[in-house]
Amino acid sequence: MAGKGVIVDFDFAVANGSEILFKTAKEFLKELDGIKLDESLEARYLAGNGYEDGFSRLFAVAKTKKTAPKAAREFAAAFARQLTDAVPKAVGPSAKNFIKALVEKGVKLVVATRADLEAVKSALAFVPEEQMAFYRETSDCYGACRWDTWLRAAHDAQIGRPLARALAGSGFSVRSALRAGLGTAAVVTPHVAYQDFGGANVILDELSGKTAKKFMEALRI
């Protein structure tokens, strides 16, 4: 249906942001004060929380004197750099087929990202300009978009809430998209498979031409 738009959590639904985030956090914390991060600690203290809040909780357990606000700012910049480096590889043939299938249906794509916008625009240059919008994601939520991100992205692209759909890359993003009142699809990668994806209209294990059809049918596009 023409007029509908898909808000894409590029960092976690297109790029393998959950793995990049974990690796970045692991290296960052080790260099910061020798703090060892594993998947269990990440899930318990960081996932779904704001950077500062998550670090504050983790630092209390690690008994470090490092301050969470400063660490959060530095970590956000480090993640953005790593994410930007991964952009070209993220938009490979399979992801392109998924995107092209939506474009052929007249769907407008609104890409929310923390990566460098010029890098993302370059990777998506095959999409007609009139069917593409970009939103600078500024929230500091670890591994997810906040609920108001979805609404702001839709508003900036002039897509009414009833016509907006969300493509999320984590259980926390599914929850926030549902809170925003959006029909939601989720791309589930191994690193986030433990999260709760309940409420998503459809679960995808990858982006491809085949899953694009499944996506559009489930979300009535």
Predicted regions, residues:
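Asp-based, Mg2+/Mn2+-dependent phosphohydrolase catalytic module
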Residues: 1-3, 117, 121-221
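N-terminal helical cap/lid subdomain that shapes the substrate entry/recognition surface
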Residues: 3-93
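Short glycine/serine/threonine/alanine-rich loop segments
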Residues: 34-35, 107, 159, 182
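N-terminal-biased segments
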Residues: 44, 49, 55-61, 109, ...
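Short, acidic loop-to-helix structural element flanking the phosphoryl-transfer center
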Residues: 81-111, 121, 147
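Conserved phosphate-coupling serine/threonine residues in phosphotransfer and NTP-handling enzymes
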Residues: 113-115
